[in-house]
Amino acid sequence: MKFLVFAFILALMVSMIGADSSEEKFLRRIGRFGYGYGPYQPVPEQPLYPQPYQPQYQQYTF
């Protein structure tokens, strides 16, 4: 019984992998694979951590 469950899961995995790769081949053949994506645009660098709030101090002249 355990062997049948293992064989069923293995067959299901193989069929899903095959279905995914055939879809990619189909989309590549009709020229729509990656459609809608523009050229590479670098992501602007952001600080690793949010900066603490820095209040603007008013400078008084004495």
UniProtKB/Swiss-Prot annotation:
- Location within or outside the cell: Secreted
**What protein name is recorded for this chain?**
Statherin
Q: Which family does it belong to?
A: Belongs to the histatin/statherin family.
Tell me where it mainly resides: secreted
Alphabetically ordered keywords of this record:
Biomineralization, Isopeptide bond, Phosphoprotein, Secreted, Signal, Sulfation
UniProt-annotated stretches for the region Hydrophobic: 38-62
Extract the InterPro entries matched here.
Histatin/statherin, Statherin
What this protein is reported to do is described as: Salivary protein that stabilizes saliva supersaturated with calcium salts by inhibiting the precipitation of calcium phosphate salts. It also modulates hydroxyapatite crystal formation on the tooth surface.
Position of the signal peptide: 1-19
Please report the organism this UniProt entry assigns to the protein.
Homo sapiens (Human)
The entry lists its GO molecular-function terms as:
extracellular matrix constituent, lubricant activity; hydroxyapatite binding; structural constituent of tooth enamel
**Modification Phosphoserine, positions:** S21, S22
UniProt KW Secreted keyword: yes
**Higher taxonomy:** Eukaryota, Metazoa, Chordata, Craniata, Vertebrata
A GO biological process held by the record: negative regulation of bone mineralization
> Where expressed (tissue)?
Secreted by parotid and submandibular glands.
What GO CC annotations are associated with the protein?
Answer: extracellular region
Q: Where is this region: Hydroxyapatite-binding?
A: 20-25
UniProt's post-translational modification comment states:
Substrate for transglutaminase-2. Cyclized forms account for about 1% of total statherin in saliva.
One Pfam annotation reads Statherin
What top-level branch of life does the organism fall under? Eukaryota
Isoglutamyl lysine isopeptide (Lys-Gln) crosslink - at what positions?
Answer: K25-Q56, K25-Q58
